[in-house]
Amino acid sequence: LFLLDSDVVKKICQYHLLHELAAALGCGLNAFAVLPQLKFQLRLADVAKAVQKLGSQEAVDQARELVAAAAEVQVVAEAANPILGLNRPDIDSGEATLFAALHDVDADSLISGDKRAFIALSEINGVAVVDVLWARLICLEEAMHLIVQSANFDHVSAKVRANLAVDTAIGIAFGRATANSPAMVIEALASYMSDLHARTSGKYVLP
C-alpha cells in the first residue's frame, strides 16, 4: 500500500491529480491507505463545507472517490510499536500514526507533505526501526516529479497552474506568471528534494 497523509490527499485532490498519481505509481485507488480522520478533516459528509475546504466540486469528488476505495490506516497497540514510543513533539499524531503503520508493514510506502516530520525523524539517530523507514518515504515534490514523468506534461502543468494557491513551492516550480518548461519543472522539483535530503542529514533517499 501507499499510505497518504492528509496534506498530500488535500493538495493532490485540489490539483485534480489523484488518478495521475495512481498511474504514476502503477496502482489503483485501492492501493492507497488514508487516516481514518481524513473524511472529517476534509468535511466530506457536507458538500458545501467540503467545497469550501477543497476549493472545487471536482476536488471533493476525487477526495470522496479516494476515501471510498482506499484502506484506512490501522496501527497495532502502542506497546507493540516502537515508533509510537518515540514521543517527538515535532511529529504530530497523524504523521506518528503513519510512521508506525510503515513500521508494521515492510512493503508499504508513505507519501507525506509534512517536511517538518521528516526533519524531526532525521534527528533520531542510531535507532534501527527508524533508519529502515527512509527508503519508503516520499515527499510531495517527489510525488509530483513522478506524475510529471509519467503523465502528459501540459495537462499536469495546466492543472497545477490553475490552482497556484494550493502549494507555494509547487506553484513556483511550474511557473506562476508564465508556465515553466518540463526541464525547468523537473529541475525545480529535484532542487526541493535535494534540499530535503540536506535538511535530513542525507537520510531522505533521492529518486
Segments predicted by a language model, with ranges:
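Active-site-proximal, substrate-binding regions of enzyme catalytic domains
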Residues: 1-108, 115-207
